[in-house]
Curated annotation (Swiss-Prot):
<keyword id="KW-0489">Methyltransferase</keyword>
<keyword id="KW-0963">Cytoplasm</keyword>
<dbReference type="InterPro" id="IPR015507">
    <property type="entry name" value="rRNA-MeTfrase_E"/>
</dbReference>
<feature type="binding site">
    <location>
        <position position="96"/>
    </location>
    <ligand>
        <name>S-adenosyl-L-methionine</name>
    </ligand>
</feature>
<dbReference type="GO" id="GO:0005737">
    <property type="term" value="C:cytoplasm"/>
</dbReference>
<dbReference type="GO" id="GO:0008650">
    <property type="term" value="F:rRNA (uridine-2'-O-)-methyltransferase activity"/>
</dbReference>
<dbReference type="InterPro" id="IPR050082">
    <property type="entry name" value="RNA_methyltr_RlmE"/>
</dbReference>
<comment type="function">
    <text>Specifically methylates the uridine in position 2552 of 23S rRNA at the 2'-O position of the ribose in the fully assembled 50S ribosomal subunit.</text>
</comment>
<keyword id="KW-0698">rRNA processing</keyword>
<protein>
    <recommendedName>
        <fullName>Ribosomal RNA large subunit methyltransferase E</fullName>
        <ecNumber>2.1.1.166</ecNumber>
    </recommendedName>
</protein>
<feature type="binding site">
    <location>
        <position position="121"/>
    </location>
    <ligand>
        <name>S-adenosyl-L-methionine</name>
    </ligand>
</feature>
<dbReference type="InterPro" id="IPR029063">
    <property type="entry name" value="SAM-dependent_MTases_sf"/>
</dbReference>
<feature type="binding site">
    <location>
        <position position="60"/>
    </location>
    <ligand>
        <name>S-adenosyl-L-methionine</name>
    </ligand>
</feature>
<feature type="binding site">
    <location>
        <position position="80"/>
    </location>
    <ligand>
        <name>S-adenosyl-L-methionine</name>
    </ligand>
</feature>
<feature type="active site" description="Proton acceptor">
    <location>
        <position position="161"/>
    </location>
</feature>
<feature type="binding site">
    <location>
        <position position="62"/>
    </location>
    <ligand>
        <name>S-adenosyl-L-methionine</name>
    </ligand>
</feature>
<keyword id="KW-0949">S-adenosyl-L-methionine</keyword>
Amino acid sequence: MKRNKTSKAWMHEHLNDTYVQRANAEGYRARAAYKLMEIDERDRLLRPGRVVVDLGAAPGSWCQVARQRVGSDGRVLALDILPMDPVPGVDFLQGDFTEDAVLAELESRLAGAAVDLVLSDMAPNLSGVATVDQARSIYLCELALDFARRHLKPGGQFLVKVFQGEGFMGFRKAMDEVFLSVQVRKPKASRDRSAEVYLLGVDLR
């Protein structure tokens, strides 16, 4: 009974969420689009002609925003373990980012191109055990950071979703070693009660 009440409360909140309503009206696949838009409007990440890699891309709202903003001269490559309906102009790879073969395929599709911006909205499948889920989340962040370190061009940028908790400060320190500047972003579309924040690494060392 408690679970049913919780599910109904979540659905009521979801359907009445301003960002959900905007996403439906404006053709975006998820409210997360507005998180990226707000950060981009502040930090100018998605410039015309840029090469962008979107990790944890499904259902595709960040791809939609990135594709619109980098323009016809830009390029967007996306990856997710889940399937994703095609986004016009986006090269999508379905696979598990923790697997070497999937990483190799993603790198093959880059074909040696230097990347301007790596986005990571990855999150693990939740087990319900907070310590386990947090450790898995930080691990995905570390993998994304390693990818960014190896593929960003000098001066490149990295935006990653991180959940505050065990391992957060250690990951923040790791980003400080890779980027000249690391900033915390908490967009308005991110629910206040959520432990998620976004770390923005600017200017790859």
